[in-house]
Amino acid sequence: MSKSSCEKMVSKHVVWLDSYVTRQDRNILNKHNSGLLWFTGLSAAGKSTIAHLVEKELFKREIRAYVFDGDNIRHGLNSNLGFSREDRKENLRRIAEVSKLFVDAGFIVLACFISPYRDDRAYIRQRFAGDNFFEIYVKCSIAECIKRDPKGQYDKALKGIIPNYTGVSAPYEEPENPDLIINTEVMDLTSSVQRVLDFLDHTILAGKTQGRDLTPLPTSIKG
């Protein structure tokens, strides 16, 4: 049986089970709304550096936030994926689903992924259907990214050691209508972090958490 056939069979017979504690309940407990900031841009543009500093500032404010870093994810959850077009798509599909779980759990997720293709980013936006999803384009020229090259990856890619490397031997499609642009060739790190924090304060954190009654608990075991 093919993989696609197995997936269709599982999808047909697996039933979603709702929790008795909702996302809204968790947001009320946390005293803030949850949501996803999706940082896209070339390697070395500054995505993870900015996101981790934003996370630290949110932590100081007692706001629950978590960074998903593209390299870190490939050490575990996505360690079986490469960098072909198909694997890149699956890499982002998995992250979108995990991000949804974290957002449902009440977190502000800061996802840092090159995510070079517009259709993949559009898929992620559609999965959240406008539900506190915001795309942040961390903009930086390929020349500047090569100059920075903190991991030495561009050097290897230019020498042909690393294939399918975004910006060198694989394309990066710039966002056409991102929710926020951070140009790290123009803005310093402190200003970049503050810009994201200000953006959060006017979007995800601006909404008032509203109360609701908890889902009635079952009186008997059903499964």
Name each region found by the language model.
Residues 47:
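Conserved lysine of the Walker
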